[in-house]
Amino acid sequence: MVTGYRMTEDEFVLLACFYELAAIPAWIVREPEELDLERVLGKLERRGLVQKMDGQDVPHLVIDFLFSEMAHSPCTAGGTDRIFCWFGAHAALALERNVTALSLMPFQTPQELFAYLRETGYERENLAFAQLDPAQDDAAAQLKETWEAGFEQG
């Protein structure tokens, strides 16, 4: 069973801006300027995803880890209207779009993520592989091989 962190699109957009994510799903259409920051921060605080410390809003350690992984991820895979994946140095993450919310799911290895994608049928949607940083050619090539091998093992 995958443990996920449910959040609204507004909450995700606010955190994505804070962590300066280079890649987000195309189906996220909210612009940061459209957000009611006080309302969104209030919801994040009530849910324990952001905490007040010395008058500052500080993300929970788990949220900090997950969004830092996404921000420093050299490669992503995405391309459907329901799921988007990041492959970081210490975790693989999937953002799944549900009817009312987004679920951010961390996996310890890419293989665990591939298994989840197979179980839920996402691999049949032909997730497109995208390379963010051309300077990361070796890492991107290795990730693409791992990605393809992960689906072949199923």
What is the meaning of each model-derived region?
Residues 22-25, 51, 73, 123-124, ...:
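Short secondary-structure junctions and interdomain/linker hinges
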Residues 1-45, 55:
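Short, amphipathic alpha-helical interface elements at domain boundaries
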